[in-house]
Amino acid sequence: NVEFAIKLQGNVLVPLDSHFPVERFKAIDDAHQRDDKKAMIDARTKLAKAFKDKAKSVNEKYIVPPKTTDFGIVYAPTESLYKELTDYQDPSSKELLTQELMKKHKVVICGPNTLSAYLQSLHMGFQSLKVQKGAT
């Protein structure tokens, strides 16, 4: 089961799962401490792969419209992890990880400071739709 499901108007659920591959994240810090650029690139690539796998899993298991939204959220529980993810750019395609996950798997990455803002914007969007439907 998904870790959290946020209920929106109309009983539509937003699937929200958290992910924190500690060893992958720790490897980045270790490489940074050693000033080992090659190890740092390798560690960041492995962290990105872990989140790609998680996004794929969330998409396959929990995104099931019309019961859910057509997207899911993966929560990165620390700001430093969130920053690593939002900064990561695929070396060959030059695409940002966050863009790739949204395009391929319809998954948004949120961190501690962005989750509440993202959920608030969803709420406001649904409120706006409700007002528009009431006006017609």
Indicate residue ranges for each PLM-predicted region.
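Amphipathic, heptad-repeat alpha-helical coiled-coil/stalk segments that mediate oligomerization
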Residues: 1-136
